[in-house]
């Protein structure tokens, strides 16, 4: 599970922290400095929730697609946009303008003022919210992380500090995330779409750097979701036989892909025998003990010269004010809220997991902005 992947190609995510803080503080910091009043700048922080909610509303109203369909340099008024939205509300344009002007002030949309009023267009940030020719955008990740079931979990995140063993999602919903997704079709669909879109964006970058798939004949994707990652790999390397191993309720939503076989199962009980195994955004879902159990099952399923290929964001040893740190820190908090012991890790911590599971050697391949491919080898190469 991951939601930061889109930062590899989309500046709206690589700058989202900057945008939020700038929006909150821009109009008040100078005044606070002049008057010596610190509380005034804090008012902006108290309203940070407004920006992501405005962004979600614009997505649900199809605003970005409407502007895109009007042309690459289109500048539309709220009335122009509302004309494409199924509503009979006479004040819709006024209400929409109030949402869009916040996005404009936050540099998510371009905004200009004409004699008739404000007009809005796409910029470098918001183009990432429009589906590409391959129908890929960062929208599925945004919709998942702002889903009510996910957001409600964060109300209990303080309990992780106050009490040992608390999982905010479980406390909020009475079951773990994957059980909940198995029962709630909306959440299951949203999660699968988010992981699928993120996988496609990720592998565009992975293929530029990592060449480890070139000579593989078989690859089992353990916890592979609806098979998007494996389909991307097999499409690029059609000589690979792909097996997507996932829980039955996830496989039930999986489309058919050329060269990919869907196999239901539970990675905690066992893994299909395989020449090579892929774990993409799986280990960060779990604590060390569960991660080691997954890796031990992979170790058992591999031949003597087999390899587990792991794809994760990696925490830098020294945190900084940069995309590499931010890309790992944001999903780390998401893992804290959703999963039992889930967390992002450093290369040293990943090496420790591999060694604890019996792997003899680890190799690390930095991709971009904190994303890494890792190889866990059963024997020394």
UniProtKB/Swiss-Prot annotation:
Q: Is the Iron-sulfur keyword given for this protein?
A: no
List the Pfam families: Dimerisation (PF08100), Methyltransf_2 (PF00891)
- Per the UniProt record, which residue ranges are transmembrane? none
What does this gene product do?
Produces a precursor of protoberberine alkaloids.
Q: Which branch of life, at top level? A: Eukaryota
Do you know which PROSITE patterns this protein is assigned to? SAM_OMT_II
- Matching PANTHER family: O-METHYLTRANSFERASE (PTHR11746)
**MF terms per GO, please?**
(S)-scoulerine 9-O-methyltransferase activity; O-methyltransferase activity; protein dimerization activity
- Supply the EC number(s): 2.1.1.117
Protein name, please? (S)-scoulerine 9-O-methyltransferase
GO BP terms, alphabetized: methylation
Reaction(s) catalysed by this chain, per the record, are: (S)-scoulerine + S-adenosyl-L-methionine = (S)-tetrahydrocolumbamine + S-adenosyl-L-homocysteine + H(+)
Keyword list (alphabetical) reads: Methyltransferase, S-adenosyl-L-methionine, Transferase
S-adenosyl-L-methionine found in the keyword field: yes
Q: What class of enzyme is it?
A: transferase
What positions does UniProt annotate as the active site of this protein?
Answer: 284 (proton acceptor)
Give residues annotated as binding S-adenosyl-L-methionine: 223, 246, 266-267, 280
The family classification in the record reads: Belongs to the class I-like SAM-binding methyltransferase superfamily. Cation-independent O-methyltransferase family. COMT subfamily.
